[in-house]
């Protein structure tokens, strides 16, 4: 799952969907390090020690709390502290209860997918495309398991910041026919 949040479409979609400001991307929410993704994909049987080496670039059992690795969209530093947690740093602060719930549910889905993943892959994928962003993110959410009526509100909130259509990858395919029908109706009525 970590490889799915590579500097590719999924990471870009997540950052755009949750509304991460460009000013945060420069310091507090840097994109995932390519070398980390490549190292973790090469590691066929990961252990805590090998994951630590993959994350820090070398085995670091005692790290400085505020080191450079901490300021990534995905922060694994707390795994080696007493917390044993993962931190998603791509969210902006909000007090809207529905947005907070949607963001929390999204994090749970990401964590569940990562936990259940049998393997990881760093293969190149289709690049981020503004025209199909909403559609691509909807498909990503459905693959995470966010399908059905109980996730409808979450999908709506997370896709609100993305351009494009959630139903059509390249925009509506029936537009020419709809335009022709509208012109025909206008000619008859006008």
What do these predicted ranges mean?
Residues 1-190:
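C-terminal accessory/tail domains of diverse enzymes
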């Amino acid at each position: 799952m970590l490889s799915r949040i590579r500097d590719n479409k999924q990471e870009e979609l997540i950052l755009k969907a949750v509304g991460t400001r460009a000013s945060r991307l420069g310091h507090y929410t840097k994109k995932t390090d390519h070398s980390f993704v490549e190292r973790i994909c090469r590691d066929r049987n990961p252990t805590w020690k090998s994951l630590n080496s993959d994350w820090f670039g070398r085995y670091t059992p005692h790290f400085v709390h505020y080191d450079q690795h901490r300021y990534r969209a995905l922060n694994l530093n707390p795994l080696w502290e007493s917390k044993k947690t993962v931190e998603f740093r791509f969210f902006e602060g909000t007090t809207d209860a529905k947005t907070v719930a949607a963001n929390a549910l999204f994090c749970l889905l990401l964590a569940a997918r990562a936990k259940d993943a049998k393997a990881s892959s760093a293969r190149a994928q289709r690049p981020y495309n503004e025209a199909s962003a909403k559609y691509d993110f909807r498909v990503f959410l459905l693959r995470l398991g966010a399908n059905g009526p109980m996730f409808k509100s979450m999908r709506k909130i997370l896709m609100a910041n993305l351009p494009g259509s959630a139903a059509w990858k390249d925009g509506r395919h029936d537009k020419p026919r709809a335009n022709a029908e509208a012109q025909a109706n206008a000619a008859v009525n006008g």
